[in-house]
Regions:
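Acidic, low-complexity intrinsically disordered regions
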Residues: 6, 15, 29, 33, ...
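Alpha-helical transmembrane spans
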Residues: 10-81
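Intrinsic disorder/low-complexity segments enriched in polar/charged and small flexible residues
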Residues: 12, 35, 91, 113, ...
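Short secondary-structure capping micro-motifs at structural edges
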Residues: 78-83, 142-146
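Acidic, Ser/Thr-rich low-complexity segments on the non-lumenal side of membrane proteins
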Residues: 89-134
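A membrane-cytosol interface segment of integral membrane proteins
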Residues: 126-216, 220-223
Length: 224
């Protein structure tokens, strides 16, 4: 079966393995940066005089920053799993994309334009609102000088989700049968952050409920 033939992306075994590998790498990097911090402090305390402290402060600070950053990856990674459990993969070709500000939004971030699943003629900008792990994607979005083979690495675009709320994008792994570089995208109105009201995008009740199960914050159903 093709990846797009499964009822949800999570039913596709290579996708499950890709997500597990994604989580393992986060854990490995977290342990690694903690080990760097502990090891550096141990060397400073056990083998060096206090005069070397200023030399180690930047390293300890950077190791702390990187360890905290790995912790910050866990929550969006669990949301990735929730999205994959709700939506099937789609293979999208020639998806409109840009590195500069989209004319329909306020934020100056990279974006894809994805069709509204209930109104395919409507293109919805889906932004890279979280700046974590975006450099790989930014290089492949490219510019007029970017090599075509680099841009081709995100053709087709693996897409699972609803662009009105929350989605996962990925690139093709080796052989094209498994995803790699799983990345969470979402609308700011779907985050549930204080002061940001959710919006329903005129979505059907079924679409709203599906998005809610995928981890998006959506309005409560209107009373009948």
């Amino acid at each position: 079966m093709r990846p797009t033939d499964y009822s949800t992306a999570w039913d596709h075994p290579p996708t499950r393995r890709a997500w597990i590998q994604h989580m393992i790498m986060i854990a490995v990097r977290l342990v690694g940066w903690i080990a760097v911090w502990v090891g550096s402090l141990g060397v400073l305390v056990s083998f060096l005089s206090p005069g070397f402290t200023p030399l180690f402060v930047p390293l300890l600070g950077y190791a702390t920053y990187r360890a905290v950053l790995q912790l910050a990856y866990f929550r969006p990674s669990t949301t990735i799993q929730r999205v994959l459990r709700q939506y099937p993969w789609q293979f999208l070709m020639d998806v409109p994309r840009g590195r500069n500000k989209h004319p329909q939004v306020q934020e100056d971030e990279m974006w894809f334009e994805i069709p509204n699943p209930e109104k395919p003629e409507e293109q919805i900008p889906l932004l890279f609102l979280a700046n974590m792990r975006t450099f790989w994607w930014m290089r492949r979005f490219g510019t007029s000088r970017t090599k075509p083979e680099l841009k081709a690495q995100i053709e087709p675009l693996w897409f699972a989700g609803d662009p009105r709320f929350v989605a996962v994008v990925a690139a093709s792994g080796r052989g094209g049968e498994a995803p790699k570089r799983l990345h969470l995208l979402y609308q700011r109105t779907a985050t549930g952050r204080r002061g940001i009201a959710p919006t329903d995008w005129n979505a059907s009740p079924a679409a709203l409920e599906r998005a809610r199960r995928a981890g998006a914050h959506v309005p409560d159903p209107s009373p009948q």
